[in-house]
């Protein structure tokens, strides 16, 4: 694929957002003008990432639920199974705890392969129950995500890349959290924004001083320089 810009995999929360989690409007035109495939890779459920693509005016190419679900070329790919996750959720509530998002629970309503639990809930209890069911917990800084250890953005990327006629190694990635580590390991070039956690900073090829949306824009400048 001969494009001016390399394929780009980019996180949402903490990377395209401001500190208050609202999307930095400046990033939308950058995504729209990117001369290469853009894959939005997030821990959010699929509809949120698809909506972002639609609002930005770009093709809907998405890795969601930390690699549990992907959408590309009108094809929906699943890399996880919800049965063990549902058992953890039930056991957590049976132990007297709450998932933490209220009765409507818009955080998990459209999830298919993992569970997101509020960070106000006890991590030790959640981690123990997850381990009992062969799962583990990733703290993204926004929620505790219960999922299979093998399920990640980085492990989902090769299947998405193949459908775009490129490889995972052709991609540049920008992110901010522990759930971006495997993505950084899978791509050819990686950037952690300045607000990234230590896991992401340790895995990234380049750590930027600029934070949040400013960090993404700084990464774009470096990629294009």
Curated annotation (Swiss-Prot):
- The residues listed in the UniProt record as binding substrate, with positions renumbered to this chain, are 153
Q: Return the InterPro entries for the record.
A: HAD-like_sf, HAD-SF_hydro_IIB, HAD_sf, PGPase
One Gene Ontology term, aspect cellular component? cytosol
What is the required cofactor set for this protein? Mg(2+)
Task: Kindly state which reaction or reactions the protein catalyses.
Answer: 2-phosphoglycolate + H2O = glycolate + phosphate
Give the family this protein belongs to, as stated in its UniProt record: Belongs to the archaeal SPP-like hydrolase family.
Protein name, entry field: Phosphoglycolate phosphatase
Organism annotation: Halobacterium salinarum (strain ATCC 700922 / JCM 11081 / NRC-1)
């Amino acid at each position: 694929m001969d494009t001016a810009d390399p394929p780009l995999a980019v996180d949402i929360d903490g990377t395209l957002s401001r500190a208050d989690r609202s999307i930095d409007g400046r990033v939308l035109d950058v995504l729209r003008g990117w001369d290469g495939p853009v894959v939005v890779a997030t821990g959010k459920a699929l509809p949120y990432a698809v909506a972002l693509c639609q609002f930005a005016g770009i093709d809907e190419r998405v890795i969601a639920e930390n690699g549990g679900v992907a959408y590309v070329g009108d094809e929906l790919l699943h890399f996880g199974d919800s049965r063990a996750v549902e058992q953890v959720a039930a056991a957590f509530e049976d132990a007297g705890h709450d998932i933490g998002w209220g009765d409507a629970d818009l955080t998990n309503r459209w999830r298919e392969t993992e569970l997101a639990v509020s960070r106000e809930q006890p991590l030790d209890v959640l981690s123990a129950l997850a381990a009992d069911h062969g799962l583990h917990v990733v703290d993204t800084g926004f929620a505790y995500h219960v999922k299979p250890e093998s399920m990640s953005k980085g492990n989902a990327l090769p299947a998405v890349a193949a459908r775009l006629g490129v490889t995972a190694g052709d991609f540049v990635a920008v992110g901010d959290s522990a759930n971006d580590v495997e993505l950084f390991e899978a791509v050819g070039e990686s950037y952690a924004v300045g607000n990234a956690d230590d896991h992401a900073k340790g895995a990234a090829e380049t750590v930027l001083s600029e934070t949040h949306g400013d960090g993404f824009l700084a990464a774009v400048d470096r990629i294009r320089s």
